[in-house]
Amino acid sequence: MTIVEDAKKGLITEEMKVVAKSEGVTEDFIRRGIAGGHIVIPMTPYRKVKLCGIGSGLRTKVNASIGTSSDIVNVEEELEKARQAELAGADSLMELSTGGDFLDIRRRVCEQSNLSVGSVPLYQAFIEAARNKGGVVFMDEDDLFKITEQQAKLGTNFMAIHTGINYETVKRLKNQGRHGGLVSRGGAFMTAWMLHNEMENPLYRRFDYLVEILKEHEVTLSFGNGMRAGACHDATDRAAIQELLINAELADQAHNAGVQCILEGPGHIPLDEIKTNVQLEKRVTNNKPFYMLGPLVTDIAPGYDDRVAAIGASVSSAAGADFICYVTPAEHLALPTPEEVYEGVMSSRIAAHVGDMVKLPKTREADLEMGHARRDLDWERQYAVSINAEKARCIRNSRMPADSDACTMCGDFCAIKIVQKTFNF
């Protein structure tokens, strides 16, 4: 039985116990969430991982995407990115290589990492078709399902599957047009294949078979957002909403079959549309976990997109999004370095916490403790509460004040020290 089937029968598994303890909730809260499709625990029978729960009533989780490109294939650097992501506190990885030996890269990432690992089988299927047959449009759909099973057996915990791209979504995209085009690689690959071959998306047409594969290997199904906007001006358009509605219906089918489900959301969206998108997803999917890709709330800040995404992620989390995909400073410019991966994870973790302060009041306890530590000029306590104690300590130690209680921002005129002489806080 899958964990969904166990939960529906009232059984509490070891995985549920682990997540309940880490989240500070009851085991039955987790069980009921999984049974209802509101919570997932990405799993795999093929390797041990650090389990995390994603969904309603739990802390917002952060994913870090890594992987080679056709221009840069450096496996050791990708492994270092995986290490840096874990060091920075990411909850999961997505291995999205589009260059090199896909099997070897993904196997090594899964062997090295303690985190849940996600993948996009469609990438490998289409790129191998381009390498071996002369173009992505010559992909054999049977190969797509074989690759899906192959990746599951490597120990992949969740997969982004582009099921919601069908004739209806493509028609709406074509009729409507866009300012920023189609930016999802999976969406672009599948749309090109459908139009060239005059065939329906096999992931949609053969969805029952896909679910059988994922269920057999206990893989969580993350419904890919192939029609997501690549520019804020295109957000919340007909193609994106059509895809969401299709994926919502398919998610019910998959959950009823015993497969855990997540739905992916926007990547570029104005700030004032975020809450609407989260509420819409939660409504039409019966509160299934929502995975926001960033999101970026302006398109004019290349080089700073980790900060732009952190703004969007904090609002998304506060509105009810459950899972955030990080963005690095290199977004839209280059393949990120390990250092940029680390910074991207940190930015997203801060954003996730900011959102959690709104929807999960108990997460404010750390901020309360920091307030007390600052009031008391207790620097060690401040470091301990910090999201990145090493960086905080390093900055202060590089510019130590004459008075060890204070810092060089205020020096002799530290507001806290002045007030301490007057009030007994």
Curated annotation (Swiss-Prot):
Zn(2+) binds at residues 268, 332. Keywords: 4Fe-4S, Iron, Iron-sulfur, Lyase, Metal-binding, S-adenosyl-L-methionine, Thiamine biosynthesis, Zinc. GO terms for molecular function: 4 iron, 4 sulfur cluster binding; carbon-carbon lyase activity; zinc ion binding. [4Fe-4S] cluster binds at residues 407, 410, 414. One of its GO terms (biological process) is thiamine biosynthetic process. Pathway: Cofactor biosynthesis; thiamine diphosphate biosynthesis. InterPro entries: ThiC, ThiC/Bza_core_dom, ThiC/BzaA/B. Substrate binds at residues 94, 123, 162, 184-186, 225-228, 264, 291. It is an enzyme of class 4 (lyase). It catalyses: 5-amino-1-(5-phospho-beta-D-ribosyl)imidazole + S-adenosyl-L-methionine = 4-amino-2-methyl-5-(phosphooxymethyl)pyrimidine + CO + 5'-deoxyadenosine + formate + L-methionine + 3 H(+). Its cofactor is [4Fe-4S] cluster. Binds 1 [4Fe-4S] cluster per subunit. The cluster is coordinated with 3 cysteines and an exchangeable S-adenosyl-L-methionine. Pfam families: ThiC_Rad_SAM. Belongs to the ThiC family. Catalyzes the synthesis of the hydroxymethylpyrimidine phosphate (HMP-P) moiety of thiamine from aminoimidazole ribotide (AIR) in a radical S-adenosyl-L-methionine (SAM)-dependent reaction. This is Phosphomethylpyrimidine synthase.
